Design a protein with these regions (language model features):
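Conserved short alpha-helical segments that host acidic/polar catalytic motifs at enzyme active sites
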Residues: 1-76, 81-139, 145
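Short, flexible loop segments at the rims of nucleotide/cofactor-binding pockets, characterized by
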Residues: 3, 119-121, 184-187, 212
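Secondary-structure transition/capping motifs at alpha-helix termini
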Residues: 5-6, 134-140, 158-165, 198-202
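Active-site lining segments that contact anionic ligands and/or coordinate catalytic metals
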Residues: 22-23, 42, 76-77, 165, ...
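A cytosolic small-molecule/anion-sensing beta-strand core signal
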Residues: 29, 202, 210
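Flexible loop/turn segments at secondary-structure boundaries
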Residues: 34, 42-43, 63-64, 88-89, ...
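Extended, hydrophobic alpha-helical segments in both membrane/secreted and soluble proteins
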Residues: 142, 149-156, 160, 164, ...
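Short, glycine/charge-rich flexible loops or terminal/linker lids adjacent to PRPP-binding catalytic cores
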Residues: 161-207, 217
Length: 218
């Protein structure tokens, strides 16, 4: 099907109205930079500025790295058009219920990012503290599954008063294991990626904290 809209932004809106799902889209067309966040706001999209230059990124830490300032999050269903005249905002989609993905706070976003106005690192520590309040058992040490389980484990340790230690050592030269196509591949990669630290864990009662359990491989 071909859109009958006269301009690029109109055609883009026509195309996106056919999609019911999660996206944060950034594209360059003619002399414009266009950013669109899906109507449910499942994924974040952030506007930043460095001097006279406008930027769009999926995480605030990307703006920090290039010396830009975070201006604001795009609203669910918002389209930003950036051109030589500046920035203009449009809300071209029908308003629907927000469905922000909680996994941004749990796993997807970097700990040094701010998502929807809240720091990811502190959100993860708070989740760990809440877990300690709800489900604490007697233990000698709180151990994280590195690296993404570290903030939650710190929060758990602070809330419970049980010492935190590094009982699992991560090999940072092994790539992503979660996205391996087969279970055998994921299992083999985890064996290379993580190793128990006997000096820390031998003879100890351990509470092991991870950010989430999807397949249970780690």
């Amino acid at each position: 099907a071909r859109s009958h809209q006269a301009d690029v932004t109109g055609r883009l809106v026509d195309a996106l109205k056919q999609i019911d799902g999660a996206y944060s889209l950034v594209c360059v067309a003619d002399d414009m930079l266009i950013g669109v966040r899906d109507p449910h706001g499942v994924r974040p999209l952030i506007l930043g500025k460095r001097d006279d230059t406008w930027l769009l990124a999926s995480e605030s830490c990307a703006l920090d790295i290039v010396g830009a300032t975070v201006v604001r999050d795009l609203e669910p269903g918002e389209m930003l058009i950036i051109d030589k005249n500046g920035v203009r905002s449009e809300m071209p989609f029908q308003q629907v219920a927000p469905r922000f993905c909680v996994f941004e706070y749990v796993y997807f976003s970097r700990p040094d990012s701010i998502v929807e106005g809240r720091g990811v690192y502190h959100a993860r520590k708070a989740i760990g503290g809440e877990l300690a309040s709800e489900s604490h058992i007697d233990a000698d040490l709180i151990i994280p599954v590195p690296d993404s389980g570290v903030p939650a484990a710190l929060g758990y340790a602070e809330k419970s008063g049980v010492p935190f230690d590094l009982g699992i050592i991560r090999n940072h030269y092994v790539g992503r294991t979660f996205i391996q196509p087969t279970q055998k591949g994921r299992t083999d990669s985890v064996k290379l990626k993580h190793n128990a630290n006997p000096a820390a864990v031998k003879g100890k009662r351990i509470v092991l904290v991870d950010d989430s359990i999807v397949r249970g491989t780690t």
